[in-house]
């Protein structure tokens, strides 16, 4: 093939499309039909080239209600940044970490926010954690994306405004875990410019930013992550005193 790999991702349709070309969002049936076509091409490429070449993103499987493929399907996870194989990697990493033997796990109750698309899978991980360690309670909140509207359902586009609106008065603990994928590169602001500190103040709780990898997520649930030290601001003066 002329390219190393191709990621197939469903278009995200927001509520702000007035005057733009009409796009029809995928539903469970159309996502399943599209997956069937892509998986046929994947099988052909794997037979001819020894790898899939075409990689459907995780959204297709979640929309279609299908289990994501095993790790072998994703080869080297070349399209991870486009959301291809992210859930499989998260799931396997989380499960491996959860199986690691532990003793004296302290009781802990937390709330976790995520997008509506991944919520069933995150709940699965939360329930698995509670089953192994009954003293750990994890309440998962699926945040409906009112800020962007439309069919936007991924965790990475959830805003602080929507979290406040949907979680205020509904938390089961004083700790809210926010996946770092919801924050900008600086890891301190949501897409609506609300800071993690402002979120905590609005909800009256502590905010814990948790890693997007499965092992880190598992450790966060168990209270094993140490807070990262804050970077010191450097002050420079040029000329004069």
Whereabouts are the PLM-identified features?
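Auxiliary Fe-S-binding modules of radical SAM enzymes
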Residues: 5-7, 12-241
């Amino acid at each position: 093939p002329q390219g190393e790999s191709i990621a197939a991702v469903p278009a995200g349709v927001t509520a702000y499309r007035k005057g733009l070309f009409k796009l029809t969002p995928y539903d469970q049936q159309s996502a399943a039909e599209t997956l069937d076509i892509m998986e046929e091409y994947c099988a052909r490429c794997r037979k001819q080239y020894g790898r899939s070449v075409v990689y459907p993103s995780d959204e297709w499987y979640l929309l279609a209600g299908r289990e994501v493929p095993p790790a072998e399907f994703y080869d080297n996870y070349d399209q991870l940044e486009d959301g291809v194989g992210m859930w499989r990697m998260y799931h396997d990493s989380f499960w491996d970490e959860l199986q690691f033997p532990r003793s004296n796990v302290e009781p802990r109750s937390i709330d976790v926010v995520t997008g509506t698309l991944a919520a069933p899978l995150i709940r699965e991980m939360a329930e698995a954690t509670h089953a192994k360690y009954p003293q750990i309670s994890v309440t998962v909140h699926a945040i409906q994306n009112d800020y962007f509207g439309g069919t936007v359902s991924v965790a990475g586009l959830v805003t602080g405004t929507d979290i406040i609106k949907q979680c205020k008065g509904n938390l089961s603990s004083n700790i809210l875990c926010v996946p770092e994928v919801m924050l900008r590169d600086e890891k301190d602001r949501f897409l609506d410019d609300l800071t993690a500190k402002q979120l905590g103040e609005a909800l009256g709780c502590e905010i814990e930013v948790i890693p997007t990898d499965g092992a880190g997520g598992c450790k966060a649930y168990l209270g094993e992550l140490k807070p990262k030290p804050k970077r010191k601001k450097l002050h420079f003066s040029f000329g004069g005193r």
